[in-house]
């Protein structure tokens, strides 16, 4: 089952990843085993915002990323290529996927997932009840 929303000339697709019970526990273990050597971007409220790990260290991340690519094509008509490493010659030094780890009560600020991307996604691996709320805004609005 999925929900499709129109927003600012684009589309937002909400979908539950099938069989998440089969891969989320493995991905959480892989993340926690490797988080100490993650590359970090910047801090928000005292915590590291984006944690970048090599896909070889979090191999189960391929499952939701491939699912997002397939949903983009099937539900949105967007053909895309999955990148697990920065493009050669790119000024971007981090892989194009990352993890955010927040304790209860912590949150992130306004940011853009779609800079130079035709498809972007968010997967919640574990969160408290009534958390994980996404807020969207139009260009020029805050």
Feature-to-residue mapping (PLM):
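Catalytic core of non-heme Fe(II) oxygenases with the double-stranded beta-helix
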Residues: 93-142
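Non-heme Fe(II)/2-oxoglutarate
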Residues: 1-88
């Amino acid at each position: 089952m999925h929900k499709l929303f129109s927003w600012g000339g684009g589309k937002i697709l909400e979908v539950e990843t099938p069989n998440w019970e089969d891969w989320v526990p493995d991905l959480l273990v892989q993340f926690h085993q490797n988080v100490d050597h993650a590359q970090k971007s910047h801090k928000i409220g005292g915590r590291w915002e984006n944690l970048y790990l090599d896909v070889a260290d979090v191999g189960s991340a391929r499952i939701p990323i491939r699912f997002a690519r397939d949903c983009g094509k099937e539900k949105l008509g967007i053909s895309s290529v999955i990148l697990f490493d920065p493009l050669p010659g790119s000024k971007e030094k981090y892989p194009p996927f990352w993890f955010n780890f927040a304790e209860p009560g912590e949150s992130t600020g306004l940011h853009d997932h779609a800079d130079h991307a035709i498809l972007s996604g968010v997967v919640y691996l574990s969160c408290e009840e009534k958390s994980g709320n996404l807020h969207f805004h139009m260009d020029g609005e805050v």
